[in-house]
Regions:
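Non-catalytic interface/targeting segments
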Residues: 1-53, 110-122
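Short active-site-adjacent helix-start/loop capping segments
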Residues: 42-44, 75-78, 104
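C-terminal structural segments of small proteins and small subunits
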Residues: 88, 92-120
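Mid-chain, well-packed structural core segment of small domains
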Residues: 59-95
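A short, acidic, amphipathic alpha-helical segment used as a generic capping/interface helix at domain edges
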Residues: 51-61
């Protein structure tokens, strides 16, 4: 079978993940980060319990269609007040564990959606 290069090859994809790391295009990251199709940004929030309303300002400024919040090894839902600014900006939010967020991010990038994955390891 003849394979062709994918035109989406220039987008950031999550190529691996595990306990305490995520690899984006093969580059390993060991701290919280925000992954978007065109950039990867460090995220100052180290753990779920550190989330505050201002934690989402960086991702909100990028104006994604949807934010995937990866909450570490298990799914944990933030208080609605913490994410109110996303709702007010009409940015969707999906909360899931880190592994599900990584998989979902890649699917949405393949669909050429404006997605941001805000990924926490703890």
């Amino acid at each position: 079978m003849k394979l062709h290069a994918d035109a989406r090859g220039s987008y950031n994809l999550i190529t691996a993940y595990g306990a305490g790391y995520v690899a984006v295009n093969g580059q390993r990251h060991n701290a919280s980060l925000i992954v978007m199709p065109d950039r990867v940004l460090p995220w100052s929030v180290a753990a779920f319990d550190e989330l505050a309303p201002e934690s989402f300002e960086l991702v909100k400024s990028e104006k994604p269609e949807i934010v995937l919040l990866g909450t570490g090894p298990k799914q944990r839902f933030p208080d609605p007040g913490l994410t109110a600014s996303l709702r007010e900006a009409r940015i969707g939010l999906e909360v899931m564990d880190l592994q599900a967020a990584c998989r979902t991010y890649n699917i949405l990038v393949a669909e050429e959606r404006r997605v941001a994955a805000a990924l926490l390891f703890a």
